[in-house]
Amino acid sequence: MKEIISRHKAGEQIGICSVCSAHPLVIESALRFDLNSGNKVLIEATSNQVNQFGGYTGMKPADFRDFVYGIAQEVGFPRERLILGGDHLGPNCWQNEPADTAMEKSVELIKAYVAAGFSKIHLDASMSCADDPTPLDPMVVAKRAALLCQAAETTATDEQKRHLTYVIGTEVPVPGGEASAINAVHVTREQDAARTLQTHQAAFRALGLDEALNRVIAIVVQPGVEFDHTQIIHYQPQAAQALSAWIKETPMVYEAHSTDYQTRQAYRALVRDHYAILKVGPALTFALREAIFALAQMENELVSPEQRSRVMEVIDEVMLNEPGYWKKYYRPTWSQAMIDIHFSLSDRIRYYWPHPRIRQSVEKLIANLNNVTLPLGLISQFMPVQFERLSEGVLTPTPHNLIIDKIQDVLRAYRFGCTPDVA
């Protein structure tokens, strides 16, 4: 990370896409995408996804590391080009507890991530706990972030400290996505970004963390990009010019969250304007979902009814029987809720792919289609971009390859934005 940031600060319009997903096919797609490019790949886990108690994936930080390393080994991707990050590390998961106990757990969370070899750490203590006022005083946020940083510094080995970097601040929706519709986005004011930096510097120095301040590479801000279930707010560079200008006077860059579904030109403009770390998550699993739905349509054409995976029906059955991950997010009307379940940009379906019934039906879908020849016309009908790539000779038409390439469509847009010499 330090090399990428220093190159950006030296004047290169270079950035990095942060892949925020625990889905094995998404991680495989990212590693295969940059297998021969020489680029670093940044993969991040969030605190609610992966923590010392297992998170919703059931993985602790060391488990997630081994999970990613296992995929890297299968792909042949060298570990030295992998950067592991932890996102929203702080009391996010324990906001309903008193601040003291939430912070104790947050300290252990940080220690677990750093000990497991995660080198990009987002120190996020912005959320109010059960006995806190709302919103929190910025100095309280900074002091708590400094305590988390202290835990990281005391845990890291000398070798780990060579690579250890911190991200501070937050200007983002609740980790996991917006719960309601958005109409407009407040772009961070440069004076608020400056205050975030100043309060964190003071809090770090008060704990003797002067050396750690040199590891702070980025501030999270809101440049004016967002999405909800049905709409996208696109980047408007002119609205963020003052913010973009301010960061030039610091040794840092910005980190932008929720950059999913922006245009490739928007990614290039964001990187140009010093939002050099672009986070993406739901757009990747949205592309995965599109690929699986497309393959299900092909299966309906090619496989007899009694042999089909019924993947679409299984998804509906599971999500309707177990609505915990989508009910409070989606529209209450039945017909609208079904549209959201299938096609929402926030892609709450991503939480259901590990479900045993859904996983088995996806495996059967892929096995069924591996046993037949996929007609080019059918691929053109349901996956037209992949059909073009087949015609160009850069893709072979297996179900697995089609899924991987569909996910990589998203990564291609980020590569355009993060790499100035890509046309």
From Swiss-Prot:
Entry keyword annotation includes DNA-binding? no
Record's GO cellular component terms: plasma membrane
Q: Does the keyword Heme apply?
A: no
Pfam families from the xrefs? GatZ_KbaZ-like
| Cysteine disulfide partners in this protein | none
Report the pathway entry: Carbohydrate metabolism; D-tagatose 6-phosphate degradation; D-glyceraldehyde 3-phosphate and glycerone phosphate from D-tagatose 6-phosphate: step 2/2
Highest taxon of the lineage: Bacteria
Task: Print the keywords alphabetically.
Answer: Galactitol metabolism
State any GO BP term from the record. Answer: galactitol metabolic process
Which PANTHER family does this entry report, sorted A to Z? D-TAGATOSE-1,6-BISPHOSPHATE ALDOLASE SUBUNIT GATZ (PTHR32502:SF12), N-ACETYLGALACTOSAMINE PERMEASE II COMPONENT-RELATED (PTHR32502)
Recorded hits in HAMAP family, A to Z, give: Tagatose_aldol_GatZ
Q: Which family does it belong to?
A: Belongs to the GatZ/KbaZ family. GatZ subfamily.
Q: How does it assemble?
A: Forms a complex with GatY.
What is the purpose of this protein?
A: Component of the tagatose-1,6-bisphosphate aldolase GatYZ that is required for full activity and stability of the Y subunit. Could have a chaperone-like function for the proper and stable folding of GatY. When expressed alone, GatZ does not show any aldolase activity. Is involved in the catabolism of galactitol.
Q: What is this protein called?
A: D-tagatose-1,6-bisphosphate aldolase subunit GatZ
Question: What species is given as this protein's source?
Answer: Salmonella schwarzengrund (strain CVM19633)
Taxonomic classification:
Bacteria, Pseudomonadati, Pseudomonadota, Gammaproteobacteria, Enterobacterales
- Write the gene name: gatZ
